């Protein structure tokens, strides 16, 4: 680190500019009379010395910075392994000590030299608790915001115009304005927050972030994508549209080489296990590990929706207290909550998203909303995230969220997505706020916040091209070819299309449930659920070397129609996947 070249500063900024810069630095270092009075008198000299050090050194290096780190003094030591790890990757970090308000902290970021080269902002520390009121009053932190003992970083509050009509708080908690350099409502750089409340939580989370990127190179679970869905309850028309659009997004947005599971809180669906086992099944899916774990449905700050079934009490899908049951065995998943309020990091106690992130064996990152959400804007956001992750395979999670948010606030047609055009058309007819769709999208850009590291490198499996004949007759062999990039065990499978079941359904109706003894009432439901999530007709295993491969697969027991051929190669340090389509014809 270097001291400031004051002669350069005076010539570059002029007298007035220098005074403004010094004022911002002073505020950014959290020095103001009222705050210093709250620090114990015996610690005044220590406080001034520490603040002076951070003013002169931590925020004053004139270098090409790509990442701004907003971190309280009290958490810096716990963050140090992350800093060293990222710097070894080539990142240039600029530290900013949070001020007493989000506005002052943002002003410090805007005043940084060479700000145009900044690509990401990491906020470290929890936010003060929102109480209520038109001005976004917040509970006074202990120690006070702005002292060197505080571990909190304030957030912004935006006036709600659309979601407040449907029961939301009048203000939307959002970190987005930190990354909106020109104030146009569109984020300009990647952004994330690690909402740790103490050094221990941060130390543990930093270790897990580093482990996520360095370990799990060949873990089978990195090809998993898990979906959990609640029942809409918006009315038959809206629920039908949401179901149709969700199927389209999931079916077309995720490559067929990935293994997708669905757990649906509708007792009449084959994707619903026995109702009493639903919550544990949801947690089991998480604990399997995966690239993503996505919840779609109703939510609140501390719990998700409930499952309702005949002769059963309301059964919670997931509660914040269930975080203790998270014991992920594979790749810690990135969690996405397409639901209301689950990401309210300004809550008096840790929200469901924060608890999933901070659990010792929990999620590696969470994207969730701080307030009441709407189906249209969430669908637009989800569509864009699927494309950024699976079509373009953006390297970092921060990039995925950044580009998804930019597309969310863009006018129709800018994204080039046919799904976006469909969503806009449906919303114009079916949305209760059809005249405020632009405002709805803007509010969702604010309320969806990434709780996690924006520099996190997504742990994708590697891909390869798989080829086979377009048609095969049932009972004959299908030749599958691929160019293996690694040595390992290859598994070649013929599977159903997503949403197509291999077996006939059991009877799921109210009369059948009520006519059955309680001990046998839900018999077969969990077995059918497992079958619905097992699409494999045929599976063959071969050891392969690097280079062209050709494997013959006997296609028997498969139904006629369009099927999918999947290939997975398990190497010592890599997992490689690919897929192709084949039509199975009857004899």
Give, region by region, the residue ranges found by the protein language model:
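Structured catalytic cores of large enzymes
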Residues: 85-88, 103-261, 276, 412-416, ...
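Catalytic-core segments of thiol-dependent peptidases
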Residues: 112-135, 143-144, 231-232, 238-241, ...
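Catalytic cores of nucleophile-dependent amide-cleaving enzymes
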Residues: 153-208, 301, 306-382
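Surface beta-strand/loop "capping" patches
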Residues: 455-490
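Beta-strand-rich binding/interaction modules
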Residues: 477-507, 563-567
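Aromatic sugar-binding surface patches on proteins
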Residues: 518-552
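Edge beta-strands of extracellular beta-sandwich domains
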Residues: 574-585
């Amino acid at each position: 680190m270097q001291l400031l070249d004051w002669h350069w500063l005076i010539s570059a900024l002029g007298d007035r500019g220098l005074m403004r810069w010094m004022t911002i630095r002073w505020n950014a270092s959290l020095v103001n009379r009222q705050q210093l009075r709250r620090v114990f008198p015996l610690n005044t000299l220590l406080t001034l010395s520490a603040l002076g050090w951070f003013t002169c050194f931590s925020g004053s290096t004139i270098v090409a910075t790509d990442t701004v780190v907003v971190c309280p003094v009290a958490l810096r030591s716990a963050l140090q392994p992350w800093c060293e790890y990222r710097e070894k990757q080539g990142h240039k970090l600029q530290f900013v000590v949070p001020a007493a308000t989000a506005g002052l902290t943002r002003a410090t970021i805007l005043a940084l030299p060479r700000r145009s080269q900044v690509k990401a902002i990491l906020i470290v520390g929890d936010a003060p608790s929102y109480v209520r009121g038109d001005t976004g009053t917040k509970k006074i932190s202990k120690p006070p915001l702005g002292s060197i003992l505080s571990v909190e970083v304030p957030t912004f509050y935006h006036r709600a115009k659309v979601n407040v009509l449907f029961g939301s708080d009048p203000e939307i908690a959002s970190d987005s304005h930190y990354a909106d350099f020109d104030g146009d409502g569109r984020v300009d750089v990647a952004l994330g927050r690690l909402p740790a409340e103490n050094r221990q939580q941060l130390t543990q989370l930093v270790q897990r972030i580093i482990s996520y990127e360095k370990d799990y190179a060949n873990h089978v679970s990195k090809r998993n994508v898990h979906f959990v869905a609640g029942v809409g309850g918006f009315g038959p028309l809206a629920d039908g549209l949401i179901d149709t659009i969700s199927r389209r997004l999931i079916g077309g947005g995720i490559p067929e080489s990935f293994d997708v599971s669905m757990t649906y809180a509708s007792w009449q669906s084959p994707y619903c296990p026995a109702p009493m086992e639903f919550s544990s099944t949801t947690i089991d899916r998480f604990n399997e590990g995966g690239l993503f774990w996505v919840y779609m449905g109703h939510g609140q700050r501390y719990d998700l929706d409930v499952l309702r079934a005949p002769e059963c009490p309301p059964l919670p899908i997931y509660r914040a207290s269930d975080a203790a049951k998270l014991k992920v065995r594979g790749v810690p998943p990135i969690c996405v909550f397409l639901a209301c309020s689950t990401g309210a990091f300004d809550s008096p106690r840790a929200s469901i998203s924060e608890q999933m992130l901070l659990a010792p064996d929990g999620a590696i990152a969470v994207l969730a909303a701080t307030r009441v959400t709407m189906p249209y804007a969430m669908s637009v956001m989800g569509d864009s995230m699927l494309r950024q992750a699976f079509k373009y395979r953006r390297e970092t999670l921060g990039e995925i969220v950044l580009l998804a948010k930019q597309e969310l606030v863009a006018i129709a047609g800018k994204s080039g997505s046919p799904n976006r055009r469909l969503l806009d058309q449906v919303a114009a007819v079916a949305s209760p706020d059809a005249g405020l769709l632009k405002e709805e999208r803007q509010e969702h850009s604010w309320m969806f916040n990434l709780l996690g590291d924006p520099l996190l490198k997504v742990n994708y499996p590697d891909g390869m091209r798989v080829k086979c004949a377009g048609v095969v007759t049932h009972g004959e062999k299908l030749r599958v070819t691929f160019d293996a990039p690694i040595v390992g065990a290859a598994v070649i499978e013929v599977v159903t299309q997503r949403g197509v079941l291999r077996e006939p359904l059991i009877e799921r109706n109210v009369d059948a449930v009520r006519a059955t003894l309680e001990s046998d009432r839900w018999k077969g439901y969990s077995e059918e659920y497992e079958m619905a999530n097992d699409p494999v007709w045929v599976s063959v295993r071969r050891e392969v070397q690097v280079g062209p491969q050709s494997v013959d697969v006997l296609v028997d027991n498969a139904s006629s129609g369009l099927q999918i051929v999947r290939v997975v190669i398990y190497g010592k340090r890599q997992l490689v996947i690919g897929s192709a389509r084949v039509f199975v014809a009857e004899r």
